[in-house]
């Protein structure tokens, strides 16, 4: 494992919504540079920046038109280089978002691929051999190009799939992964990675990392082979570069080239039971049914989380990091279902479990999900992509543009959380996050790869549903319920309480936890 990942805490930035420095209503790279001190003081020493490459923005930048050009609305390539330099001066690493599975339909590669005559890019994308042919089970578009064929899509209509080949060949137009055209696609993506790494980028979050090869085996044999090939290149040329997969499959990703994978919010999985448990994960107006572990009155035990988490953790913890998120640009903000006190306990827990935690911009102040009309292909996700709320000035300090010209509306509620309002409040969520991350950085026992052991995780019985775990020589304990409890643990005599949220004390060698409390002993 790269040494810098052991103490890494990431901050995810949706660039168009973070901070606008030129008054056009859209956040920019200079805005990120301007807020680096805030990010560092929060306790984050690494960034994941959502797509910032040139794009028509039909899917918020996940439809790339030019992999080697910063989108003009965010700035220039020179701004990207300046961001890398400024971040590194402050001890902050920067990961860009890489979209290797598809491009925009406006990408020059795709425009060339649409031509009827054979050229360098004819097989850069997946085409059938007839304008009347279906996609063999994959979504496809036909009748829009000079070329006699239909092309395969990865997601939206605007995102033609790049050709990495097929694991199982069903049609004569499908190519094996070792076909020269498919190998050329891999090499082209390596070239993109080299371009940004040479400029100072520290690695990539990889979009839809498991989806490269079509008709792959159940264990993604051929896609995994591609990522091992890319990792071999990185290990030789950029040994400190990190890769994190959008996969939620650590048994595959961490053993095949990735340093990290996300523990994503999938309906009914362990993370979902821990933090969310919405009634309909894709609902544009989500209804939390109060069953998440951290909901005070849920009655849900920690076993719902551990039954899913522990087998995968035990199978992969020596290979890399399976990382917790507070939220991301694709999910409903956690404040939609958890109160501030519940968020405090949730953050304390995921910040002290294994892996490198990821904080989504604004979650540190409890920004709210806003039910908004879709923007740039966001649909239900749009409400989690609103401008960062810095203060109580116009547009919450995000931009000097007129309100009707900013990227998305800000939260106009009188009690909308802001950085400025919480900065001087010692009891604020913001300062709770700061103190938690400061404690994490000060104790190597909370490093991403430090030993982890479950000490006490009984099945829920009414309001009795604690969770106690060990990281190195530290013991962490949480009580999400609304009643005080005592834990039947034999504690070493020299153990002292080092950190608390709520009330916690050691009485007669027993740990007593107040209602909705968290403690670290050491």
Which residues does each predicted region cover?
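Acidic/aromatic-lined carbohydrate-recognition and catalytic surfaces
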Residues: 2-187, 198, 209-256, 388
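Loop/helix patches that line or flank the sugar-binding groove of alpha-linked glycan CAZymes
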Residues: 4-6, 235-237, 249, 254-257, ...
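Short beta-strand segments
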Residues: 12, 48-51, 204-208, 244-246, ...
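Conserved alpha/beta catalytic core and glycan-binding cleft of carbohydrate-active enzymes
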Residues: 105-141, 231-387, 392
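A Trp-anchored, charged/polar loop motif used as the substrate-binding/catalytic surface
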Residues: 181-192, 196, 299-310
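Active-site groove signature of glycoside hydrolases
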Residues: 193-215, 324-328
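Beta-strand-rich binding/interaction modules
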Residues: 484-501
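C-terminal beta-strand-rich structural cap/linker in extracellular carbohydrate-active enzymes
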Residues: 507-522
